[in-house]
Structures are given as structure tokens and as C-alpha cells.
């Protein structure tokens, strides 16, 4: 019976679609690989649905990580029962039915994991005693493995007969909106916080009655995580078109006031200004170097008298400097942490000593000047402006203490600096001097070594001390903006290259499939060539994930950068000609204001002075025309 099955040649048993099926599995696996940062904040929505009626009993949304976004859910028992139940009079259609439901105990049985003998949906997964895992009954049902616990909430003593306040008069004591007098509280257990909520979980609920059949209802609990969808390309491949030379500085012209049209002329719609052109590669590189120079010139003017600033052409292009700073605690996720992201971005070089949080291993304790342990509780640690948390799971602007307490993660507070080296003029001159002279290995000073700690030690410590602090903040923010723009353009370039590679691989796969169809009788292309089959493993999914990670981190840094600006600084960023206009008219306005303030006082002083001098002159004239008589002495 089995002989003929093994008597055929081996190539006849090769499924011609096998390579394509395996290839599709490999590609799908490569694309679906996700490297979630445990500190990433998502918009999580929990939804409790009555499966008997399809209505939503509760929908709660909050911002949090995948580890600590497990709130308490409040809803009413009548949201799960409905107007009518198995028997007449047990529903929540009337106030009496709602009040009667409050007198019964209830128990809940899980439908996501049904033990043997517990039945199915018809029995509410409570086919026998012992299947219940939670509820509110005299025997106190409980479980160590179920995902939730469901108990009754606090019912006011003056609740009354569960009247609906929207139907009856307001004078009836205890009436509530909708007649909701059976509050329930759903909490997640430790097992529920560790479980996978990729799909809905189902439970059955039954009212306990001493006689008769216990009525059944079913509900589901679903978690929905909102995330930013994929970005679809439209138009030609912009990989090469983005490589633009440095643009010439454009002279800013003040806008002219609109001229009124002549009488009888047709109205002309003004043309809109063309959109601003994106900076090219040369502009971005020059902005990085210019921002580095501005920050260095402010902090160390002696070093910028004559120097060379060189942008490193090889990776790593950025480095981190550990700093000490004061983070802020938030009970809920801040706005700059709410952008959804999927993947990790790390730093290959971190120097200095700064603030560390979590369980730092011995190999990285040299980066820590101060190590703080997080206390129990669920809150978020937001990095100060200009800094970011460098964790072993990736870069993030916020930390979740729940993740730190449950894992062995650690984070260091760092500043992000471009890899710009500083050289003295002597070093550059020696590179062009003639003659074979022995040269020492130069000591490369990077921008991180020269300006490390500027955010926390220089600018942040001097905030509010005057004009110097304001100028320092502006120079540092200029460098931050240049770094942000450069990272954004690098992300776009790599994303475009990844798309080109994916398109090329799709063409190759189509050719491979066509050849397999042509050699279908021979068992496929590999069998016809009598060679080992090679399968293409596409790792562009990981590239796409990391680029999405970088894009979202850039958005977070942009929001943090904008939130750190005051109203006065943001006023100058609204329009390109606003700064020039203000600087032009500010001087005359200040002079006019000073004249209006101090002019009357000065004029009064001047008039009084003139009057005094005139009085003195008049007195001198009178004394010259008359002389004083000598007194005559009379003899007695």
C-alpha cells in the first residue's frame, strides 16, 4: 500500500508553489516584526460590550504604556442585562425590575478559557459549580488565573426604587439618570495585566436564585490601541531630487500695503505666495555647523577667534552626553509623550556622568553620577527641555515607572549633540605645509565635549538672569532646530531608499514566480536547474519600522521644543518678515515713548530755569539804577 507513494522521483514531490509560500511567510514575518519600546505611550481604549444586545456598556480611553494602562471600569448591571432577560420581570425595563436585580447575587465565568464541563455560551460558561472565577455572592467566588474581577460598587442608601430622573419628577428621592442603581466595578488582576489582549475576551454572568434557573447574559472586553497608520507615497521617487546645493541667502522684503483698485476696475484676486522650498543637503549640513558655531561662540568666545569646525562624515553622526537634571512627575502621560510609536532608536556613544534611573548594570554605572530608584505607583517621568532619556530599550522623552518597577530597564538623562569636531588653525595649516615632517596624532575635540551640559548647567541654571540667558537659550535652540531638521531629512532619505529596495525585490519576486510557472512540469526553477533553492529574506520591514520610530521621535522632540518656547519667542516665529519689521520700528517707537513720558517734566524744568534766570537779571538791573542810603545817626 505504501510502496508506490515512495517509488516516485523526489522532484515529483516538490510543490511548485512551495518556494513562493515559504517566501511569503518570510516576508510577512519580516514586516510584522515589532520592537516596542516599553515606555512608549499609546492611546488605549477599553470597551465592555453586551453580547446579547450588542450595546456598549463602557468605553474608557486613557494614555499609557502597554504595561500600566489597566484602569478600573465602571458600568451598571442593567447595561449587561438589558430590558428583558430569560424570565418576565427580571429585566431592567421597569424601576421594579431594576430594584429586583439589585437583590440578587451574581457570579461570572470566563469564556476565553473554558474548563472541562463548564459548557458554552448557552450556559454562560457556568455549566457546573466551580467554573465561576469572580462575582458578588455569599461564597465569594475568586480565582488566581482569571484576568478580571467584577464586584458591585457603592450604592447610595437613599437610592430609592431605581426611578429614572429623566422620566419622573425631580422631587422623587433617589432617582438617577437612566435609573442606574446597580453599579459594577471591573478591575484587572495581575494575570490580566500580563495577558495578551490582541482579541476580545468573553465572560458569562448569571444571577443566583435559590429556586429556578439562574438567568444568563454574556459580555466581552476588548482593548483597542490607536496608532499612526502607514504613510503612502505619491509621485516620483524623491531620493535624488532632495540632494540640493546650498541655497543663497534671500533678502527679506517688507510687505507693501495693498493699493486700492481704481474705480470701475475689476477686482483682482492676489496670487498666493509659493510654498517655501525644503532645505537641501548642503543647507542642512551648513545649518548644523552654523548652529554649533553659534552655541560655541556664546559659551567660549576665545575658542572661536580662529578655528575649524568639521562635520564627521562617518557614523555615528550623533552622540549623547549624560547630564544631571530635574525631571517632572506626571500622573498622566504628558502631551509630548502621546505620539504613538512602534520601534527603538538607540545611541551608539554616550559619554559623561549624569542622572540614572532604574537598575543600572555594572557595565554602565560609569555613566551615572546619581542613581535614583523609582517608588511604587504609576506615573511618568518627563525629561527636561533639551534632553531625552536614553534607555536600554531605546530613546524616549518620558518614562513609565510601572515598566521600570516590573522590569530591569534603566535609563540615563542625556543631551543629543551632532558629531562636530573642533580643530585649532595650527592643525589645519600643518596639513598643507610642504615637506615630510612627523606629525602627532591630533586630539579631536567634539562639540559634545566642549558644550556638554549646556542645557542643564548653563542655560537652565541661568534662566531669568537677564539678556545673556535669553540669548543663550536662542543659540542653543537654533542648534536643536538644525539637529531636528537634519534627522528628519535623513529619515526621509533612508525611507525612500527602503522603498526603492522593496520595489526592486517585488520585481525580482515576480520574475521568480514566472520562471516557476514556466518550469512547473519539472518541479519549479530550482529543480530544472538542479541547484539549491535560495530564498530572499527581506529585512526592509525592520528598516521601515526603525524609520517610523525615528519619525515619531522627531515629532515628539518637535512638540517638546515648541512647548518649551515662551509666547515672546513664538511671536517671532510666526512670520519671516515680522522680526525685521519689529527691529526696524522698535527704535523710533522707543524714542517716541521716552519723549512722551519724560518730555513734559523736562519742559517744565526748562521753563522754571528760564524764569529763575530772568528774575535774577531783573534784580541786577534794579540794583544798578538805585543805591542804598546810609543810615543817619542822631545825637541825643
From Swiss-Prot:
Biased composition (Pro residues): 255-264
Positions occupied by motif CX6CC: 526-534
Cellular component, GO, one term: host cell plasma membrane
Region (Receptor-binding domain (RBD)): 32-233
Coiled coil: 472-508
SUPFAM superfamilies: ENV polyprotein, receptor-binding domain, Virus ectodomain
Positions bearing carbohydrate: 43, 58, 297, 329, 336, 369, 405
Pfam families tied to this protein: TLV_coat (PF00429)
All ranges on the Extracellular side of the membrane: 33-581
Residue ranges annotated as Cytoplasmic topological domain: 603-636
Disulfide bonds: 109-126, 118-131, 307-310, 307-534, 337-391, 356-368, 398-411, 526-533
Segments traversing the membrane: 582-602
Annotated keywords: Cleavage on pair of basic residues, Coiled coil, Disulfide bond, Fusion of virus membrane with host cell membrane, Fusion of virus membrane with host membrane, Glycoprotein, Host cell membrane, Host membrane, Host-virus interaction, Lipoprotein, Membrane, Palmitate, Signal, Transmembrane, Transmembrane helix, Viral attachment to host cell, Viral envelope protein, Viral penetration into host cytoplasm, Virion, Virus entry into host cell
Chain spans, region Disordered: 254-282
Swiss-Prot/TrEMBL GO biological process terms: fusion of virus membrane with host plasma membrane; symbiont entry into host cell; virion attachment to host cell
Region (Fusion peptide): 443-463
InterPro entries: FMuLV_rcpt-bd, TLV/ENV_coat_polyprotein
Assembly and oligomerization: The mature envelope protein (Env) consists of a trimer of SU-TM heterodimers attached by a labile interchain disulfide bond.
Name the UniProt record assigns to this protein: Envelope glycoprotein
Gene from which this protein is expressed: env
Amino acid at each position: 500500500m505504501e510502496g508506490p507513494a515512495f517509488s516516485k522521483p523526489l522532484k515529483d514531490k516538490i510543490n511548485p508553489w512551495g518556494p513562493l509560500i515559504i517566501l511569503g511567510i518570510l516576508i510577512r514575518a519580516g514586516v510584522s516584526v515589532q520592537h516596542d519600546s516599553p515606555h512608549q505611550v499609546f492611546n488605549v481604549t477599553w470597551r465592555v460590550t453586551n453580547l446579547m444586545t450588542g450595546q456598549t456598556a463602557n468605553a474608557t480611553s486613557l494614555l499609557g504604556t502597554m504595561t500600566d494602562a489597566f484602569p478600573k471600569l465602571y458600568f451598571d448591571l442593567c447595561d449587561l442585562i438589558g430590558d428583558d432577560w430569560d424570565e418576565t420581570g427580571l429585566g431592567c425595563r421597569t424601576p421594579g425590575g431594576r430594584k429586583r436585580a439589585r437583590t440578587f447575587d451574581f457570579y461570572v465565568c470566563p469564556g476565553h478559557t473554558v474548563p472541562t464541563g463548564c459548557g458554552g455560551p448557552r450556559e454562560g460558561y457556568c455549566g457546573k459549580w466551580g467554573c465561576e472565577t469572580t462575582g458578588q455572592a455569599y461564597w465569594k467566588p475568586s480565582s488566581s488565573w482569571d484576568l478580571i474581577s467584577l464586584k458591585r460598587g457603592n450604592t447610595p442608601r437613599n437610592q430609592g426604587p431605581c426611578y429614572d430622573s429623566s422620566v419622573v419628577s425631580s422631587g422623587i428621592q433617589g432617582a438617577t439618570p437612566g435609573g442606574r442603581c446597580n453599579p459594577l466595578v471591573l478591575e484587572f488582576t495581575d494575570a490580566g495585566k500580563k495577558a495578551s489582549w490582541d482579541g476580545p475576551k468573553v465572560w458569562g454572568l448569571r444571577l443566583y436564585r435559590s429556586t429556578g434557573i439562574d438567568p444568563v447574559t454574556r459580555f466581552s472586553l476588548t482593548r483597542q490601541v490607536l496608532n499612526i497608520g502607514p504613510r503612502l507615497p505619491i509621485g516620483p521617487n524623491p531620493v535624488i531630487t532632495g540632494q540640493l546645493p546650498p541655497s543663497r541667502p534671500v533678502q527679506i522684503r517688507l510687505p507693501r500695503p495693498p493699493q486700492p483698485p481704481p474705480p470701475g476696475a475689476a477686482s483682482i484676486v492676489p496670487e498666493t505666495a509659493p510654498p517655501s522650498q525644503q532645505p537641501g543637503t548642503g543647507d542642512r549640513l551648513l545649518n548644523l555647523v552654523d548652529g554649533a558655531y553659534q552655541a560655541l561662540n556664546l559659551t567660549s568666545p576665545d575658542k572661536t577667534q580662529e578655528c575649524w569646525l568639521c562635520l564627521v562624515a562617518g557614523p555615528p553622526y550623533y552622540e549623547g552626553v549624560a547630564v544631571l537634571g530635574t525631571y517632572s512627575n506626571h500622573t498622566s502621560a504628558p502631551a509630548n509623550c502621546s505620539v504613538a510609536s512602534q520601534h527603538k532608536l538607540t545611541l551608539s556613544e554616550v559619554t559623561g556622568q549624569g542622572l540614572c534611573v532604574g537598575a543600572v548594570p555594572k557595565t554602565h554605572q560609569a555613566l551615572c553620577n546619581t542613581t535614583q530608584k523609582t517608588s511604587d505607583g504609576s506615573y511618568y517621568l518627563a525629561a527636561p527641555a533639551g534632553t531625552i532619556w536614553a534607555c536600554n530599550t531605546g530613546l524616549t522623552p518620558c518614562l513609565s515607572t510601572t515598566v521600570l518597577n516590573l522590569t530591569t530597564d534603566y535609563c540615563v538623562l542625556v543631551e543629543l549633540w551632532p558629531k562636530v569636531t573642533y580643530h585649532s588653525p595650527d592643525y589645519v595649516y600643518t596639513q598643507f605645509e610642504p615637506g615630510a615632517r612627523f606629525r602627532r596624532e591630533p586630539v579631536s575635540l567634539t562639540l559634545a565635549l566642549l558644550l556638554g551640559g549646556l542645557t542643564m548647567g548653563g542655560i537652565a541654571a541661568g534662566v531669568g538672569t537677564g539678556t545673556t540667558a535669553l540669548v543663550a537659550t536662542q543659540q542653543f535652540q537654533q542648534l536643536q532646530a538644525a539637529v531636528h531638521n537634519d534627522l528628519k531629512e535623513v529619515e526621509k532619505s533612508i525611507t525612500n531608499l527602503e522603498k526603492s529596495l522593496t520595489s526592486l525585490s517585488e520585481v525580482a519576486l515576480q520574475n521568480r514566480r514566472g520562471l516557476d510557472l514556466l518550469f512547473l512540469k519539472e518541479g519549479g526553477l530550482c529543480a530544472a536547474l538542479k541547484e539549491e533553492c535560495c530564498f530572499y529574506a527581506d529585512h526592509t520591514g525592520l528598516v521601515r519600522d526603525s524609520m517610523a520610530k525615528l519619525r515619531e521621535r522627531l515629532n515628539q522632540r518637535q512638540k517638546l521644543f515648541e512647548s518649551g518656547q515662551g509666547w515672546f519667542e513664538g511671536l517671532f516665529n510666526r512670520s519671516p518678515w515680522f522680526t525685521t519689521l519689529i527691529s526696524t520700528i522698535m527704535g523710533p517707537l522707543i524714542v517716541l515713548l521716552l519723549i512722551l513720558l519724560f518730555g513734559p517734566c523736562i519742559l517744565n524744568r526748562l521753563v522754571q530755569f528760564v524764569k529763575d534766570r530772568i528774575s535774577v537779571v531783573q534784580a541786577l538791573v534794579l540794583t544798578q539804577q538805585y543805591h542804598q542810603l546810609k543810615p543817619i545817626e542822631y545825637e541825643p
